[in-house]
Amino acid sequence: MRVIIVSGRSGSGKSTALNVLEDNGFFCIDNLPAVLLPELAERALLHTELLEPQVAVSIDARNLPSQLKRFPELLAEVRTRYILCDLLYLDADDKTLLKRFSETRRRHPLTNENRSLAEAIRDEGRLLTPIKDLADLKIDTTHLNLYQLRDTLKLRLLNKPEPGTAFLIESFGFKKGMPVDADLVFDVRCLPNPYWKPDLRDFSGLDQPVADYLAVQPDVEEMYQDILTYLQKWLPRFAASNRAYVTIAIGCTGGHHRSVYLADRLGQALKQSLKNVQVRHRDLC
């Protein structure tokens, strides 16, 4: 049996996550009181004919603060029952969350006459710290639209064919911000940039003309070999420490050429020795 716990600040995409999971066969429960988590797990094990073998629940700041403080012990109790349990935490920066609430005109669950929206967003983050600190997977949705978030959730949560650590090699552009959920970040902005070649500018790092150009650049090849050697040595150590998810981010200026080329090439190479290797290009439209 598999249980996915979805948490995060309001406006970060929890409802979207539950919808994606429900569309893919999960029995979903929104706003579950945290104290009921062990009971739900026990009932699911005893009555498999009543519940799907895959269950997703959201637990967030709508819980009582006293229940949120107990979350670590409640999660540990569930995991002692030998249930595969993943904890997903979604978040975005304060400015983005403020904008989303302004656009949807929805009321934040913690706002009242004495607490502004900005204060509610900050307070919610503090309340959810016991959950965030235990998250197996953190996804920053600041730069993701609805469709990108759905694709990311499918990639990270549903495209995991074998047990063990899921590795994500992600390209990105620094001009749109560094991914805050990355475990390892490699800056490749020092490499020759195809953007300054007029005949290559409109291509991406996945296109053959750009790949051919970068493949013959000595610095690019040296950077690739150095990163690959590092990852081949240390990623198995991450897996041995029982990490559920590891994100490796490769960044260039715009996230279209150098980082895309290297992320794709690294992903293909790592798939030869590691299971569950995925590649994603964050800023490639």
Swiss-Prot record:
GTP binds at residues 60-63. Keywords: ATP-binding, GTP-binding, Nucleotide-binding. Transmembrane segments: none annotated. GO terms for molecular function: ATP binding; GTP binding. It holds the Pfam family RapZ-like_N. ATP binds at residues 8-15. Belongs to the RapZ-like family. Displays ATPase and GTPase activities. This is Nucleotide-binding protein Avin_12760. It comes from Azotobacter vinelandii (strain DJ / ATCC BAA-1303). The lineage of its organism: Bacteria, Pseudomonadati, Pseudomonadota, Gammaproteobacteria, Pseudomonadales.
